Amino acid sequence: MIGNWNYGTGRRKSAVARVFIKAGKGDIIVNGKPIADYFSRETSLMIVRQPLELTNHGQTFDIKVNVTGGGETGQAGAVRHGITRALIDYDATLKPSLSTAGFVTRDAREVERKKVGLRKARRAKQFSKR
């Protein structure tokens, strides 16, 4: 807890989110913009709100987020992970329900590197029989 803010760091792919929550009326600000302006896809908004809806805290916290790196999906996942950790910092009794939903575990999948002699990570050059 930092002052009256609860803190959580979230990560997904190459995105990192620093999330601060405090009691309020449900405003979510991401990098200085309202969440609806920052995330253009409806699925991204849904991903971010999942831990709040699961714990029935949708309108009880003001959330301030700084997120860097990655694309829209990675950033949304990082924000969700950060909100989850901040909620656990606020109330540890929420951890079992968040954990069964799979929000506490960091998604460890990363982009596989490109290999020498191949076009992509696994895609080989086109083979010509003749």
UniProtKB/Swiss-Prot annotation:
The keyword Ribosomal protein applies. Disulfide bonds: none annotated. It comes from the Bacteria. SUPFAM superfamilies: Ribosomal protein S5 domain 2-like. The keyword Magnesium does not apply. Keywords: Ribonucleoprotein, Ribosomal protein. One of its GO terms (biological process) is translation. GO terms for cellular component: cytosolic small ribosomal subunit. One of its GO terms (molecular function) is structural constituent of ribosome. Coiled coil: none annotated. InterPro entries: Ribosomal_Su5_D2-typ_SF, Ribosomal_uS9, Ribosomal_uS9_bac/plastid, Ribosomal_uS9_CS, Ribsml_uS5_D2-typ_fold_subgr. HAMAP family: Ribosomal_uS9_B. NCBIfam families: PRK00132.1. Belongs to the universal ribosomal protein uS9 family. This is Small ribosomal subunit protein uS9.
